């Protein structure tokens, strides 16, 4: 009898690699975090949630060889969190592994209302606001909600707040997405700040190499899938393999897909051609201009292509020989609102600084002093730079002379 009990106990130990700690107490939100070798990021990633009073956590480790799991246990122990589970399972692909994490959350946290699925080095601002939002939304049936991810150079939205009862799941081996997410966004003041540590940058480089291999394999299986083609091109662009990126963006331009990806494809083609034209005569500014113009035509409320066009006509060291063309594109860019409803790859710098900075210079040359002064003041709100202070002084002097 004792021998049988020992065998049963051993079997139970090896049925699952889950490490479970008192999961009966559940709130409106359970944090679901998929990680691998994130020992240096775990505390900072998890801390905002603990400080805001969230007590339910599922950590899905896909093969850490560092101290990620030990650091996580220590963190929860230090903060007296007992309602957590650590699951271990080898990485498969991003959609499959995330879906397995959600399956584990369903199993261990059956009474929670929402899962917030994030990555390490995604630092959530306004966790209290998220809790309040979830309490307001908990009796509705929206399957998932978009949350912003921002840093100094990018602003986009992803469906990572998931209603547990919807059983919504991800698709896509890389740059996975939940196809039923719709367009309901959490309030703008609830957002992830994307970490940019040296540690994170090194991990990004390794991930791009892995992503490229996964996407290329998927592309070979289904060469007409527009999302796969787009992200294969984008991954090569991130890796610095610009000609490969150009090839796949050109292919993506022939495939009809999501309208924001259609726009982004032509915008990135313009950027790549403009960059290559500096060293390769096979790429020219008229080619880049056509791509930028197509992008703007697809989404005329977006300023980024116009900003690139404006800067082209005011190149460093050349001066205002094309000031009128520069002014034309810069002024239109400054008339556009920040695209709050868009989800994909907004460039905050183009809206908060660049468009105003270039109009500050161009407006003077064409005699539009009022708009030039306004643009200068707007640019200075983002960056107090010496040439802008000089421009402002010139505009103020000019205005005083006209009075």
Model-derived features: where do they sit?
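Cell-envelope/extracellular polymer assembly enzymes that use nucleotide-activated donors
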Residues: 28-30
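A conserved acidic beta->alpha catalytic loop
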Residues: 48, 52, 60-72, 90-91, ...
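Short, well-formed alpha-helical segments that are part of the catalytic scaffolds
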Residues: 37-56
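"A position-specific structural signal for the A-helix of alpha-solenoid helical repeats
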Residues: 231, 268, 275, 308, ...
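Catalytic-site signature of metal-activated, phosphate-bearing donor transferases
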Residues: 96-103, 109, 115-116, 122-247, ...
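Conserved donor nucleotide-binding strand/loop of the catalytic core
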Residues: 73-104
């Amino acid at each position: 009898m004792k021998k049988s009990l020992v065998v049963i106990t051993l079997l139970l130990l090896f049925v699952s690699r889950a490490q479970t700690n008192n999961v009966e107490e559940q709130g409106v939100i359970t944090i679901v975090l998929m990680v691998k070798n994130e020992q240096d990021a775990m505390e900072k990633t998890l801390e905002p949630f603990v400080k805001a009073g969230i007590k339910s956590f599922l950590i899905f480790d896909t093969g850490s060889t560092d101290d990620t799991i030990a650091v996580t246990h220590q963190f929860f122990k230090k903060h007296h969190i007992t309602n957590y589970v650590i699951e271990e399972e080898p990485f498969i692909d991003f959609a499959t592994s995330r879906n397995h994490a959600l399956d584990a959350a369903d199993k261990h946290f059956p009474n929670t209302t929402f899962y917030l699925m994030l990555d390490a080095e995604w630092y959530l601002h306004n966790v209290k606001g998220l809790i309040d939002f979830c309490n307001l939304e908990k009796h509705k049936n929206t399957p998932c909600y978009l949350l912003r991810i921002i840093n100094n150079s990018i602003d986009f939205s992803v469906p990572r707040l998931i209603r547990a009862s919807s059983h919504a799941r991800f698709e896509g081996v890389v740059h996975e997405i939940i196809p039923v997410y719709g367009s309901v966004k959490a309030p703008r003041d609830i957002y992830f700040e994307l970490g940019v540590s040296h540690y994170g940058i090194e991990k990004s480089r390794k991930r791009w190499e892995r992503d490229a291999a996964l996407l290329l394999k998927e592309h070979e299986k289904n060469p007409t899938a527009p999302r796969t083609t787009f992200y294969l091109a984008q991954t090569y662009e991130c890796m610095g393999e610009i000609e490969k990126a150009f090839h796949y963006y050109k292919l993506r331009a022939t495939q009809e897909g999501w309208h924001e990806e259609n726009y982004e494809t032509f915008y990135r083609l313009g950027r790549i051609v403009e960059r290559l034209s500096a060293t390769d005569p096979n790429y020219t500014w008229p080619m880049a201009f056509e791509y930028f113009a197509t992008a703007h035509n697809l989404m005329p409320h977006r300023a980024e292509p116009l900003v690139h066009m404006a800067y082209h006509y005011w190149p460093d060291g050349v001066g205002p020989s094309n000031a009128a063309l520069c002014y034309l594109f810069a002024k239109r860019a400054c008339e556009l609102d920040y695209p709050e409803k868009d989800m994909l790859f907004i460039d905050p710098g183009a809206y908060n600084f660049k468009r105003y900075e270039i109009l500050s210079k161009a407006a003077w040359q064409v005699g539009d002093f009022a708009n030039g002064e306004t643009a200068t003041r707007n640019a200075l709100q983002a960056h107090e730079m010496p040439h802008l202070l000089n421009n402002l002084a010139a505009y103020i002097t000019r205005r005083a002379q006209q009075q």
